Amino acid sequence: MSLSIIGNWKSNGSIKLNESWILEFKNCINDSEISNLAICPPFIFIDQMFNLASGLGLKIGSQDVDSSSGARTGAISVEACIDVGCCFSLIGHSERRELFHESNIDLRQKVIAAQERGLQVVFCIGEPKEQHIAATTNEFLEEQIINSLSDLELTDSFTIAYVPIWAIGTCETPDSSDINATHKFIKDIVQSTSKNNFTPNVLYGGSVTSKNAEVLFKEQYIDGALIGGASLNGKEFAEIANIHKNRGL
Protein backbone atom coordinates (compact mmCIF):
# COMPACT_ATOMS: atom_id res chain seq x y z
CA MET A 1 0.00 0.00 0.00
CA SER A 2 1.39 3.39 -1.01
CA LEU A 3 0.48 6.41 1.11
CA SER A 4 0.40 9.75 -0.70
CA ILE A 5 -1.20 12.26 1.67
CA ILE A 6 -0.51 12.01 5.41
CA GLY A 7 -1.62 14.37 8.16
CA ASN A 8 0.65 14.64 11.20
CA TRP A 9 -1.39 16.09 14.04
CA LYS A 10 1.54 16.17 16.48
CA SER A 11 0.26 16.93 20.02
CA ASN A 12 -3.05 18.37 18.87
CA GLY A 13 -6.66 17.25 18.96
CA SER A 14 -9.36 16.52 21.51
CA ILE A 15 -12.40 14.27 21.59
CA LYS A 16 -14.71 17.06 20.41
CA LEU A 17 -12.28 18.50 17.87
CA ASN A 18 -11.71 15.06 16.39
CA GLU A 19 -15.44 14.59 15.90
CA SER A 20 -15.66 17.94 14.11
CA TRP A 21 -12.63 17.09 11.99
CA ILE A 22 -14.09 13.89 10.62
CA LEU A 23 -17.36 15.63 9.69
CA GLU A 24 -15.48 18.37 7.82
CA PHE A 25 -13.38 15.77 6.05
CA LYS A 26 -16.38 13.65 5.00
CA ASN A 27 -18.19 16.69 3.63
CA CYS A 28 -15.26 17.85 1.50
CA ILE A 29 -13.50 14.74 0.20
CA ASN A 30 -14.45 14.12 -3.43
CA ASP A 31 -13.83 10.41 -3.68
CA SER A 32 -15.01 7.53 -1.53
CA GLU A 33 -11.82 5.63 -2.45
CA ILE A 34 -9.23 7.25 -0.22
CA SER A 35 -6.99 4.33 0.63
CA ASN A 36 -3.85 6.39 -0.03
CA LEU A 37 -4.78 8.95 2.65
CA ALA A 38 -3.76 8.73 6.29
CA ILE A 39 -3.56 10.67 9.53
CA CYS A 40 -1.30 10.35 12.56
CA PRO A 41 -3.24 11.58 15.60
CA PRO A 42 -1.76 11.50 19.09
CA PHE A 43 -1.62 7.87 20.19
CA ILE A 44 -4.31 8.36 22.82
CA PHE A 45 -6.83 9.31 20.09
CA ILE A 46 -6.06 6.48 17.67
CA ASP A 47 -8.92 4.26 18.81
CA GLN A 48 -11.40 7.14 18.59
CA MET A 49 -10.25 8.04 15.08
CA PHE A 50 -10.53 4.43 13.95
CA ASN A 51 -14.15 4.43 15.06
CA LEU A 52 -14.93 7.83 13.53
CA ALA A 53 -13.27 6.91 10.22
CA SER A 54 -14.86 3.47 10.02
CA GLY A 55 -15.83 2.66 6.43
CA LEU A 56 -13.98 5.60 4.93
CA GLY A 57 -10.77 3.83 4.03
CA LEU A 58 -8.73 6.49 5.82
CA LYS A 59 -5.57 4.92 7.25
CA ILE A 60 -4.35 5.59 10.79
CA GLY A 61 -0.69 5.67 11.74
CA SER A 62 1.52 6.38 14.72
CA GLN A 63 3.73 9.46 15.01
CA ASP A 64 6.60 7.37 16.35
CA VAL A 65 7.47 3.84 17.37
CA ASP A 66 10.13 2.35 19.62
CA SER A 67 12.70 -0.22 18.58
CA SER A 68 11.81 -2.60 21.42
CA SER A 69 9.30 -3.22 24.19
CA GLY A 70 9.51 -3.79 27.94
CA ALA A 71 10.79 -1.43 30.63
CA ARG A 72 10.73 1.72 28.50
CA THR A 73 8.33 4.15 30.16
CA GLY A 74 6.41 6.30 27.69
CA ALA A 75 7.60 4.38 24.63
CA ILE A 76 5.23 2.81 22.10
CA SER A 77 6.28 -0.58 20.78
CA VAL A 78 5.77 -1.85 17.25
CA GLU A 79 3.51 -4.56 18.66
CA ALA A 80 1.32 -1.95 20.38
CA CYS A 81 0.99 0.05 17.17
CA ILE A 82 -0.08 -3.01 15.20
CA ASP A 83 -2.40 -4.17 17.98
CA VAL A 84 -4.42 -0.94 17.93
CA GLY A 85 -4.65 -1.09 14.14
CA CYS A 86 -1.91 1.22 12.90
CA CYS A 87 -0.66 0.18 9.49
CA PHE A 88 2.36 2.49 9.53
CA SER A 89 4.45 4.80 11.66
CA LEU A 90 6.43 7.95 11.11
CA ILE A 91 10.07 7.52 12.08
CA GLY A 92 12.69 10.24 12.34
CA HIS A 93 10.65 13.43 12.35
CA SER A 94 12.93 16.38 13.09
CA GLU A 95 11.04 17.17 16.29
CA ARG A 96 11.83 13.67 17.56
CA ARG A 97 15.45 14.02 16.50
CA GLU A 98 15.81 17.39 18.24
CA LEU A 99 13.62 17.11 21.34
CA PHE A 100 14.37 13.46 22.14
CA HIS A 101 17.94 13.38 20.80
CA GLU A 102 17.28 10.49 18.42
CA SER A 103 20.36 9.69 16.34
CA ASN A 104 20.53 8.20 12.87
CA ILE A 105 21.59 4.91 14.48
CA ASP A 106 18.59 4.99 16.85
CA LEU A 107 16.31 5.54 13.88
CA ARG A 108 17.91 2.71 11.93
CA GLN A 109 16.98 0.34 14.77
CA LYS A 110 13.40 1.61 14.66
CA VAL A 111 13.18 1.02 10.92
CA ILE A 112 14.52 -2.52 11.32
CA ALA A 113 12.09 -3.29 14.17
CA ALA A 114 9.11 -1.99 12.19
CA GLN A 115 10.03 -3.86 9.02
CA GLU A 116 10.64 -7.13 10.86
CA ARG A 117 7.11 -7.00 12.25
CA GLY A 118 5.35 -5.80 9.10
CA LEU A 119 4.67 -2.19 10.12
CA GLN A 120 5.04 0.23 7.23
CA VAL A 121 7.52 3.08 7.64
CA VAL A 122 7.40 6.73 6.61
CA PHE A 123 10.97 7.83 7.26
CA CYS A 124 11.50 11.57 7.73
CA ILE A 125 14.64 13.44 6.73
CA GLY A 126 15.39 17.14 6.37
CA GLU A 127 18.02 19.81 6.81
CA PRO A 128 18.17 22.75 9.26
CA LYS A 129 18.41 26.37 8.16
CA GLU A 130 22.20 26.42 8.42
CA GLN A 131 22.64 23.72 5.78
CA HIS A 132 20.05 25.35 3.55
CA ILE A 133 21.86 28.69 3.66
CA ALA A 134 25.24 27.04 3.13
CA ALA A 135 23.89 25.08 0.13
CA THR A 136 24.91 21.77 1.75
CA THR A 137 21.43 20.24 1.84
CA ASN A 138 22.34 17.25 -0.31
CA GLU A 139 25.37 16.38 1.79
CA PHE A 140 23.30 16.58 4.99
CA LEU A 141 20.51 14.40 3.58
CA GLU A 142 22.95 11.87 2.19
CA GLU A 143 24.50 11.44 5.64
CA GLN A 144 21.06 10.90 7.21
CA ILE A 145 20.15 8.33 4.58
CA ILE A 146 23.41 6.38 4.61
CA ASN A 147 23.69 6.24 8.41
CA SER A 148 20.08 5.09 8.82
CA LEU A 149 19.32 3.00 5.76
CA SER A 150 22.51 1.62 4.21
CA ASP A 151 22.32 -2.08 3.29
CA LEU A 152 18.71 -2.43 4.44
CA GLU A 153 16.31 -4.29 2.18
CA LEU A 154 13.42 -1.90 1.51
CA THR A 155 10.05 -2.55 -0.12
CA ASP A 156 6.92 -0.67 -1.18
CA SER A 157 6.01 -0.51 2.52
CA PHE A 158 8.80 2.06 2.94
CA THR A 159 8.34 5.75 2.09
CA ILE A 160 10.55 8.81 2.58
CA ALA A 161 9.19 12.17 3.74
CA TYR A 162 11.47 15.11 2.96
CA VAL A 163 10.72 17.79 5.56
CA PRO A 164 13.19 20.70 5.59
CA ILE A 165 13.28 21.82 9.21
CA TRP A 166 13.38 25.51 8.34
CA ALA A 167 10.10 25.20 6.39
CA ILE A 168 8.03 23.66 9.20
CA GLY A 169 5.26 26.05 10.27
CA THR A 170 7.02 29.05 8.76
CA CYS A 171 5.15 29.57 5.46
CA GLU A 172 8.61 29.38 3.85
CA THR A 173 8.11 26.72 1.21
CA PRO A 174 11.05 26.11 -1.12
CA ASP A 175 10.53 26.60 -4.84
CA SER A 176 8.76 23.53 -6.22
CA SER A 177 11.51 22.91 -8.77
CA ASP A 178 14.10 22.89 -5.98
CA ILE A 179 12.01 20.41 -3.99
CA ASN A 180 11.66 18.27 -7.10
CA ALA A 181 15.43 18.20 -7.60
CA THR A 182 15.97 17.29 -3.95
CA HIS A 183 13.44 14.46 -4.22
CA LYS A 184 15.26 13.10 -7.27
CA PHE A 185 18.51 13.22 -5.31
CA ILE A 186 16.90 11.39 -2.36
CA LYS A 187 15.51 8.66 -4.61
CA ASP A 188 18.92 8.16 -6.21
CA ILE A 189 20.76 7.96 -2.88
CA VAL A 190 18.28 5.50 -1.36
CA GLN A 191 18.42 3.42 -4.52
CA SER A 192 22.21 3.27 -4.42
CA THR A 193 22.57 2.63 -0.68
CA SER A 194 19.75 0.12 -0.04
CA LYS A 195 20.55 -3.58 -0.22
CA ASN A 196 18.08 -4.25 -3.04
CA ASN A 197 18.48 -0.93 -4.93
CA PHE A 198 14.98 0.18 -3.97
CA THR A 199 13.63 3.53 -5.18
CA PRO A 200 11.07 4.91 -2.71
CA ASN A 201 8.18 7.29 -3.07
CA VAL A 202 9.14 10.64 -1.56
CA LEU A 203 6.57 12.92 0.09
CA TYR A 204 7.19 16.61 0.77
CA GLY A 205 6.47 18.24 4.13
CA GLY A 206 6.88 21.83 5.25
CA SER A 207 4.07 24.42 5.16
CA VAL A 208 1.97 22.49 2.63
CA THR A 209 -1.50 24.02 2.15
CA SER A 210 -4.28 23.90 -0.42
CA LYS A 211 -2.86 27.14 -1.83
CA ASN A 212 0.51 25.67 -2.84
CA ALA A 213 -0.41 21.99 -3.25
CA GLU A 214 -1.28 22.20 -6.95
CA VAL A 215 2.11 23.66 -7.85
CA LEU A 216 3.91 21.06 -5.75
CA PHE A 217 2.01 18.07 -7.13
CA LYS A 218 2.76 19.01 -10.73
CA GLU A 219 6.42 18.14 -10.15
CA GLN A 220 7.59 14.74 -11.36
CA TYR A 221 9.32 13.52 -8.21
CA ILE A 222 6.95 14.90 -5.56
CA ASP A 223 4.82 11.83 -4.85
CA GLY A 224 2.62 13.35 -2.16
CA ALA A 225 2.77 15.28 1.09
CA LEU A 226 3.27 14.96 4.83
CA ILE A 227 1.10 17.76 6.17
CA GLY A 228 1.37 19.35 9.61
CA GLY A 229 -0.70 22.37 10.61
CA ALA A 230 -2.99 22.28 7.58
CA SER A 231 -4.05 18.72 8.44
CA LEU A 232 -5.70 19.90 11.67
CA ASN A 233 -8.59 21.24 9.60
CA GLY A 234 -10.62 18.43 8.04
CA LYS A 235 -11.77 20.58 5.13
CA GLU A 236 -8.25 21.80 4.33
CA PHE A 237 -6.84 18.28 4.51
CA ALA A 238 -9.57 17.02 2.17
CA GLU A 239 -8.92 19.85 -0.28
CA ILE A 240 -5.22 18.98 -0.45
CA ALA A 241 -6.14 15.33 -1.02
CA ASN A 242 -8.54 16.32 -3.79
CA ILE A 243 -5.83 18.40 -5.48
CA HIS A 244 -3.44 15.45 -5.35
CA LYS A 245 -6.01 13.08 -6.82
CA ASN A 246 -6.76 15.46 -9.69
CA ARG A 247 -3.13 16.32 -10.49
CA GLY A 248 -2.38 16.15 -14.19
CA LEU A 249 -6.04 15.72 -15.19
Task: Write out the residue ranges for each language-model feature.
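Active-site loop-to-helix "anion-binding N-cap" substructures in soluble metabolic enzymes
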Residues: 1-249
